[in-house]
From Swiss-Prot:
It is found in: Plastid, Chloroplast. One of its GO terms (cellular component) is chloroplast. RuBisCO catalyzes two reactions: the carboxylation of D-ribulose 1,5-bisphosphate, the primary event in carbon dioxide fixation, as well as the oxidative fragmentation of the pentose substrate in the photorespiration process. Both reactions occur simultaneously and in competition at the same active site. Transmembrane segments: none annotated. The lineage of its organism: Eukaryota, Viridiplantae, Streptophyta, Embryophyta, Tracheophyta. Keywords: Calvin cycle, Carbon dioxide fixation, Chloroplast, Disulfide bond, Lyase, Magnesium, Metal-binding, Methylation, Monooxygenase, Oxidoreductase, Photorespiration, Photosynthesis, Plastid. The basic functional RuBisCO is composed of a large chain homodimer in a 'head-to-tail' conformation. In form I RuBisCO this homodimer is arranged in a barrel-like tetramer with the small subunits forming a tetrameric 'cap' on each end of the 'barrel'. The gene is rbcL. The active site is at K168, H287. Pfam families: RuBisCO_large, RuBisCO_large_N. The modification N6-carboxylysine is found at K194. It catalyses: 2 (2R)-3-phosphoglycerate + 2 H(+) = D-ribulose 1,5-bisphosphate + CO2 + H2O; D-ribulose 1,5-bisphosphate + O2 = 2-phosphoglycolate + (2R)-3-phosphoglycerate + 2 H(+). The disulfide bond which can form in the large chain dimeric partners within the hexadecamer appears to be associated with oxidative stress and protein turnover. This is Ribulose bisphosphate carboxylase large chain.
Length: 460
């Protein structure tokens, strides 16, 4: 008689991994998944399957389970609630013991939590809505290279949002002409200009030429305005070694900031670059190219607030966060929810803003949200009100599309911003009086008046 000392076969996940009586620990990583089970699969089984497949489980019982303590290491689905207004959708809450994750590795955290489970047959769809990162795990990350306060001190710019501009056309300019556009924008009054996310090192403009001409533009604009200026030099490359080579060259030129596409570049590369930037005094601007592939579907994928939290752990000083302006009111609350998760040290659970867990960042530096995409001077009051001082407002077409050229476009944006900040400080209501504030300012700024005229037809 052969006895192997364990019961072979396939058993329901919920027998092991659904534990509604479990009390979460302060050291657990908590996840909120939006689960859409296949017809006939009970939500408890679906939630337990997610917990199992993203932690210690496999599809059948294995004898090596007896060589470890599953109770210590398994993920647990500890609560399930139906999603209001959606048929057959549930929020499954899963707790993971901290021992399952390598310290200081966003890569490992995601490989575990979202690595395999999304292709699971028992589920029609699955979306990771939020993560609670416990302080014990947060403390294993360096986080942003510098954070909001250090950035302000480096740039000597306070009590207002920062202004940026993406250089367009994004592909096709020679390095010399590119540098010229950078100079004109910075000279006109912007704080930053930006490489587009897909500007790396192409035949029409190799990275080293671009870096040199942009640095020249930067120093010329600084000398003429007396303000510190920056251009986000995109260091994203095909290998980590090449990426760091570009960052090192930027540091040798003495520029203040470099840039990385963190999703296409990957978290491992991003964390390496963030460490280099802190060690060498460079700020790090992060672009989220590819995010919509992951976060756009409402019932499948990963919500951007999770990608934003992951970036704060991996490291970056700025990240693109959408604009809110002109979108629906509900979107505004959700966006401001993850903007707070980027900037603040402690964020309370607030389901109306999409925040499923209270998050304590235990003094990990904050990140400036970057509002960019289809915005112009008429949006300035709303942007100033919504995002507040700790933000970067980026106008690409809204600068370079000015009828008189790049420098006047920059002047128009700077005048509009200063007018909005002054009006706010005087106690005026930007939401109600915004258009009036811009009109008043345009009376003494012909550049702003021309910008107002060009974009007056474009409604919020």
């Amino acid at each position: 008689k052969a006895s192997v000392g364990f019961k072979a076969g396939v058993k329901d996940y919920k027998l092991t991994y659904y534990t509604p009586e479990y009390e979460t620990k302060d050291t657990d990583i908590l996840a909120a998944f939006r689960v859409t089970p296949q017809p006939g699969v009970p939500p408890e089984e679906a939630g337990a399957a997610v917990a199992a497949e993203s932690s210690t489980g496999t599809w059948t019982t294995v004898w090596t389970d007896g060589l470890t303590s599953l109770d210590r290491y398994k993920g647990r689905c500890y609560h399930i609630e139906p999603v209001a207004g959606e048929e057959n959708q549930f929020i499954a809450y899963v707790a993971y013991p901290l021992d399952l994750f390598e310290e200081g590795s966003v890569t490992n955290m995601f490989t575990s939590i979202v690595g395999n489970v999304f292709g699971f047959k028992a589920l029609r769809a699955l979306r990771l809505e939020d993560l609670r990162i416990p302080p014990a795990y947060v403390k294993t990350f360096q986080g942003p290279p510098h954070g909001i306060q250090v950035e302000r001190d480096k740039l000597n710019k306070y009590v207002r949002p920062l202004l940026g501009c993406t250089i367009k056309p994004k592909l096709g300019l020679s390095a010399k002409n590119y540098g010229r556009a950078v100079y004109e924008c910075l000279r006109g009054g912007l704080d930053f200009t930006k490489d587009d996310e897909n500007v790396n090192s192409q035949p029409f403009m190799r990275w080293r030429d671009r870096f040199l001409f942009c640095a020249e533009a930067l120093y010329k604009a600084q000398a003429e305005t007396g303000e510190i200026k920056g251009h986000y030099l995109n260091a994203t490359a095909g290998t980590c070694e090449e990426m760091l080579k570009r960052a090192i060259f930027a540091r040798e030129l003495g520029v203040p900031i470099v840039m990385h596409d963190y999703l296409t570049g990957g978290f491992t590369a991003n964390t390496s670059l963030a460490h280099y930037c802190r060690d060498n005094g460079l700020l790090l601007h992060i672009h989220r190219a590819m995010h919509a592939v992951i976060d756009r579907q409402k019932n499948h994928g990963i919500h951007f607030r999770v990608l934003a939290k992951a970036l704060r752990m991996s490291g970056g000083d700025h990240i693109h966060s959408g604009t809110v302006v002109g979108k629906l009111e509900g979107e505004r609350d959700i966006t401001l929810g993850f903007v707070d998760l980027l900037r603040d040290d402690f964020v309370e659970k607030d389901r109306s803003r999409g925040i499923y867990f209270t998050q304590d960042w235990v003094s990990l530096p904050g990140i400036l949200p970057v509002a960019s995409g289809g915005i112009h001077v008429w949006h300035m009051p709303a942007l100033t009100e919504i995002f507040g001082d700790d933000s970067v407002l980026q106008f690409g077409g809204g600068t370079l599309g000015h009828p008189w050229g790049n420098a006047p476009g920059a002047v128009a944006n700077r005048v509009a911003l200063e007018a909005c900040v002054q009006a706010r400080n005087e106690g005026r209501d930007l939401a109600r009086e915004g258009n009036e504030i811009i009109r008043e300012a345009s009376k003494w700024s012909p550049e702003l008046a021309a910008a107002c005229e060009v974009w007056k037809e474009i409604k919020f």
